[in-house]
């Protein structure tokens, strides 16, 4: 028989930087989860993704055990790293802050496609390109 799910927690935590302080501690403490056990497991699983914020979905069961799924970093983080910028622009129509090549967009798509709402690579490229444009990053061939 399957375990009874009592809660689902969605967080974005810096890779390898999970610790009992907010937002992790209070979110897990409310559900009665062993916070240090989660922090150690999360840090171990994300050790090769340092420098990114990692979305994580934690499923909590009635016996206070948990499982968690880590996703790929947000598309905006991948775009900022590929374009070499620290943040997007406040006015993407007038101010361009960086450039991405088509190849860089496809590289981001390959990392991110599992988390997108399409399985078609061309559609995924359009989604990533749209995110880049809204940040003021130009797509060049």
Swiss-Prot record:
Annotated keywords: Methylation, Ribonucleoprotein, Ribosomal protein, RNA-binding, rRNA-binding
Post-translational modifications: One or more lysine residues are methylated.
UniProt feature coiled coil, ranges: none
GO biological process, one term: translation
Keyword check for RNA-binding: yes
SUPFAM superfamilies the UniProt entry points to: Ribosomal L11/L12e N-terminal domain (SSF54747), Ribosomal protein L11, C-terminal domain (SSF46906)
GO MF, one annotated term: large ribosomal subunit rRNA binding
GO CC, alphabetical: cytosolic large ribosomal subunit
Subunit structure: Part of the ribosomal stalk of the 50S ribosomal subunit. Interacts with L10 and the large rRNA to form the base of the stalk. L10 forms an elongated spine to which L12 dimers bind in a sequential fashion forming a multimeric L10(L12)X complex.
Task performed by this protein: Forms part of the ribosomal stalk which helps the ribosome interact with GTP-bound translation factors.
Family note: Belongs to the universal ribosomal protein uL11 family.
The protein's name in its UniProt record: Large ribosomal subunit protein uL11
Native species: Campylobacter jejuni subsp. jejuni serotype O:2 (strain ATCC 700819 / NCTC 11168)
Phylogenetic classification of the source organism: Bacteria, Pseudomonadati, Campylobacterota, Epsilonproteobacteria, Campylobacterales
Chain's gene name: rplK
């Amino acid at each position: 028989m399957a375990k009874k799910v009592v809660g689902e927690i969605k967080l974005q935590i810096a890779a390898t930087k999970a610790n009992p302080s907010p937002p992790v501690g209070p979110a897990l403490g409310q559900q009665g989860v062993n916070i240090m056990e989660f922090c150690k497991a999360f840090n171990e699983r994300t050790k090769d993704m340092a420098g990114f914020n990692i979305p994580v979905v934690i499923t909590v069961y009635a016996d206070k055990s948990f499982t968690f799924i880590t996703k790929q970093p947000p598309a905006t983080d991948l775009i900022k790293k590929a374009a070499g910028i620290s943040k997007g622009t406040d006015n993407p129509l007038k101010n361009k802050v960086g450039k991405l090549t088509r190849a860089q967009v496809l590289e981001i798509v390959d990392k991110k496609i599992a988390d997108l709402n399409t399985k078609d690579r061309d559609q995924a490229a359009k989604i990533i390109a749209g995110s880049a444009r809204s940040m003021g990053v130009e797509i060049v061939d």
